[in-house]
Amino acid sequence: MAPVQAADEMYDSNPHPDRRQLVSNGFEVNLPDQVEVIVRDLPDPSKVKEERTRLMGYWFVHWFDGKLFHLRIKAGGPNVDGEHRAIRTAEHPWLLRARLDDALEEALPKYAAVKKRPFTFLAQKDELIDAAATAAGLSHRLLNSFKVIPRFALSPKIYEPVDGTTRVGVFVTIGMRYDIEASLRDLLEAGIDLRGMYVVRRKRQPGERGLLGRVRAISDDMVQLFEETDLASVNVNDAKLEGSKENFTRCLSALLGHNYKKLLNALDDQEAGYRTGPRFDDAVRRMGEFLAKKPIRLADNINAQVGDRIVFSNEGQARNVRLAPKVEYVFDRTGAKSAEYAWRGLSQFGPFDRPSFANRSPRILVVYPSSTQGKVENFLSAFRDGMGSNYSGFSKGFVDLMGLTKVEFVMCPVEVSSADRNGAHTKYNSAIEDKLAGAGEVHAGIVVLFEDHARLPDDRNPYIHTKSLLLTLGVPTQQVRMPTVLLEPKSLQYTLQNFSIATYAKLNGTPWTVNHDKAINDELVVGMGLAELSGSRTEKRQRFVGITTVFAGDGSYLLGNVSKECEYEGYSDAIRESMTGILRELKKRNNWRPGDTVRVVFHAHRPLKRVDVASIVFECTREIGSDQNIQMAFVTVSHDHPFVLIDRSERGLEAYKGSTARKGVFAPPRGAISRVGRLTRLLAVNSPQLIKRANTPLPTPLLVSLHPDSTFKDVDYLAEQALKFTSLSWRSTLPAATPVTIFYSERIAELLGRLKSIPNWSSANLNIKLKWSRWFL
């Protein structure tokens, strides 16, 4: 972890935001002013596929708002009935934007599509494993069957630099395609244990699913599978390992031994040639020049021409770039105690709820391998009492820092060795049950694990099993691995900062909040998440759980809720029931009075297809707040988009003291906000000060999108609020990559998915005793 002093230099804003230009990764596409189409009514979109197949090659077919639009691609073919119209591109940009998705592939016939929409293809000359192995001086007969190839995606998107002026751009993104071509038999003969690894079809036919399942065993010429998608066994020549980073790591570390790290570092250098700021910017420039060489044919006598780079600026009528005010961390209810940096403020003022925190003498269960007792006791002493003045990063200790009276550790040794990989979870749970039988009430748990145990599958993982047991008893837990316990003091002091914050939050404490708008009576920010529960990746039938986290406008955590498990068809009803109950409880708790102005902001990461969650929660809010003046906003906050922002004025920082390498070059400052459309903003939440390595890829911004039915429509306010909520993660002193409304929901979903595999697990207590706890941190 970087020293806390480095965090104190964050969020420079140079140059002045009004003059700032942010270069995008896209190019404007010049299109005809209008096109001739045939339009007919088609209320049922399920019939589009049939029509598209019938007209393929002659007509481009696009469904929009209950109507089917036909654009002639070439003469001949089947006839089309409907109304002939001339439509203006500026008013209907979605038609040619959709056509561009197909036309880009047709314009680049030398590149085979690995994905149709957006058109995605692989570099033809560059393969990075071979280059990395050469740079590292490594060789192995199977290395050339491991491939890492740059992958380009071209995404046509509509953007609106000024209200009423819509344009279409093509945005370039670059990823990496990992592939393992080696035969399973060769890998097996090289000593690689393939059991449990995912395999895919070596040759995939149209309409076939690529994933086959996981390897149970290989005998004769057959691969025996479990968690299979279809067949329980396949011929060994028809399958290959999935090109995942996990499979790469398992295979290459086995093949290369201690030299694997050398290859990994060299591969990191190779990938940086495409993904760090200046290199990415140059790759995008070259792609734009390539695309601009000739027109892109859209239809009969209709072409598109790739033009200039799209730049967001504040020139002319456009006001597309601004810098949000710095986030202030707040440590009391009046707002008088505030600081620019979380740890500095916490050290100076103590936690936000220090005067009202109820449990000043918490009892914490500590579960640990008995052979590590001395080392664990030293760690606990440093955590509780501090490390002294020589280690200013954690000199005080948890008790003084949080204003507690004392902390009592209830020690629970477990007779287990790191070599015990099958029965460790049983021994942990048995030790806990024996200890708690006569230990009295405990308020939190610390579970210490050997590194080997922490990496075990969930069905044998001691941490997941102990978490299941203790959560059922209403006790939140914190995991600590032995390498963390054994850290050198100069590193341990910063780790203990994060550990103390998360532990206090799990005890229902509030370390800090943020400054917020106090002009209204009440403001709630509601995070909405979704957990898809299944036994494995290959299981077809899914069950869903709605996850809700509720915060006050200042970021105070109010409560969490996990809905009942349901089938896909019942998800709408489950959300309606859950949200109505939550809002009714908060209305009573916050004492909403008739005539009060109450703002409710919903954050979602990825709305479920064919379920209009926004309409459901708006309906619930109107019902519960019928006596109040309700302002509602439904905001989607996502990293899943093709937009990148580049600040060419940013020269970056030294990667480390005395280094000539620089990190964060071309990264926009934290809080830079760029308009993409009337209801959309790009929000930079990273910065050179938060980037750790010179090879770290240029960070992508968050896309903040406001639902058009929202009654509160200040998108810039909502983008700033999303920024503030990235500063509310109580897992670290540093901001998170996403707002905690999203981050916490994702964390809960991940843990629910893992806990699902534990026998007798029940989430009931999460809505009762742990309703106000951040048990998931």
From Swiss-Prot:
* Keyword RNA-binding attributed: yes
Q: List, for all copies, the residue spans of the domain called Piwi.
A: 445-757
Q: Which InterPro entries match?
A: Piwi (IPR003165), RNaseH-like_sf (IPR012337), RNaseH_sf (IPR036397)
Q: Which GO terms describe its molecular function?
A: DNA binding; metal ion binding; RNA binding
Question: Region PAZ domain: which residues?
Answer: 183-243
Record's function text: A catalytically inactive argonaute protein. Binds 5'-phosphorylated RNA as the guide (gRNA) and short DNA as target DNA (tDNA); does not bind other nucleic acid combinations, does not bind tDNA alone. Has highest affinity for gRNA that begins with 5'-phospho-U and poor affinity for gRNA with 5'-OH. Upon expression in E.coli, plasmid sequences are found in RsAgo, its induction leads to plasmid degradation and suppression of genes encoded on foreign plasmids, suggesting it may also interfere with transcription. Does not interact with preformed gRNA:tDNA duplexes.
- Family note: Belongs to the argonaute family. Long pAgo subfamily.
Please give the name of this protein. Answer: Protein argonaute
Q: Which organism is it from?
A: Cereibacter sphaeroides (strain ATCC 17025 / ATH 2.4.3)
Upper taxonomic classification of the species? Bacteria, Pseudomonadati, Pseudomonadota, Alphaproteobacteria, Rhodobacterales
Gene responsible for this protein: ago
